Amino acid sequence: MTNQPRLVARLLAVASAAALMHALPATAAEPAAPKWDVNAPPAATVRQVPISVEAGSWMDLDVSRDGSTIAFTLLGDIYTMPISGGTATRIAEGLAWEVQPRFSPDGSRIAFTSDRGGGDNIWVMNRDGTNKLQVTKEDFRLLNQPTWSPDGRFIAAKKHFTPGRSL
């Protein structure tokens, strides 16, 4: 019987400690680092400089399946225009290098390669440039050259497997 008061005291101490732990506010977790966006680098001043060109190099080109529209890249931006000629509309622009546009089989979307997330990955956007969505998230073996499956359900892309970069 002499141990019973000691046992009760221990139980009260444990219960008090447990209650105190639940009553204390939780320590705030470290805030997540902001997601890297090439188009909005932190602490950088960005300014646009107009460039007028009459020809291009290192360009990528794709024709919509219905043959009415071309998508092409120039200086890291993606444009569309009627295949019959006319004015080009820039649908992907900014500091990110956005290249290799490929129309989906139904022509409603365009897959492309972009480094806007920090490395070359495959993205998809609507034909008019809206709703850009990153579909791969590689940070080591980077991806490029997207190709749609005939039914438009899948995208295949080239993945780098070289031990280093080359020209």
Task: Name the predicted role of every residue range.
Residues 46-81:
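Beta-strand-rich domains and repeat architectures in extracellular enzymes and scaffolds
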Residues 29-50, 68-69:
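Blade/loop signatures of beta-propeller domains
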